[in-house]
Amino acid sequence: MYHLPDTLYEQEKMPRRAKRLFVDTFSQHHKLNAGDEEAAMQKARQALEERYVRVNDLQWIPRRAAYEIIRDDMSSDSDGPAASPPGDHARPNRDKRRVSYSSSDSSARSSDDQLISARGSDDQLISTRSSDDHLVGAGKARRPARKKKRIGKVVASQKFVGGGAQYSTDDDEDDY
């Protein structure tokens, strides 16, 4: 049963995980003596192509690694070769991004602090934070923890203290 999937990747360089994924998917969809080898082979190939990318016609690498390689190549192309030495171009860019995020984050915090001291309204603070979130990006620092209300528990001020509902017995209000 394992000799059928072996025929596909005999000449290809596949990582061990990719081979295992292919064989497991093939054996899951292949029934003995059912004649569905082609369908099982196609499903195994699709499962392999979802997680791995073929490079140089014979080598397979994980899809995430391929995206990282492409992203690094694109960032190095946009910097230009004259801007930095060939080996040191990735690290300064990351540092610059971190600095810009932290400075924009601190400016957003200072504007929020000014808003609190000037107006003192929590509703306006929430609206400015939500509008500034798209500017700050993924590099922002964590906000201070807030006390959360527990679901299902009733705060003492919200409890019904009286013995029953109190209705007005005035006949003035019910004149029809």
UniProtKB/Swiss-Prot annotation:
Low complexity compositional bias, start-end: 77-87, 100-109
Q: Per the record, which residues fall in region Disordered?
A: 71-176
Specify the superkingdom.
Viruses
Output the Pfam families linked to this UniProt entry: ChaB
Enumerate composition-biased segments (Basic residues).
140-152
Note the InterPro entries from the entry.
Answer: ChaB, ChaB_sf
Protein name, entry field: Uncharacterized 19.9 kDa protein
- Organism (species): Orgyia pseudotsugata multicapsid polyhedrosis virus (OpMNPV)
Phylogenetic lineage: Viruses, Viruses incertae sedis, Naldaviricetes, Lefavirales, Baculoviridae
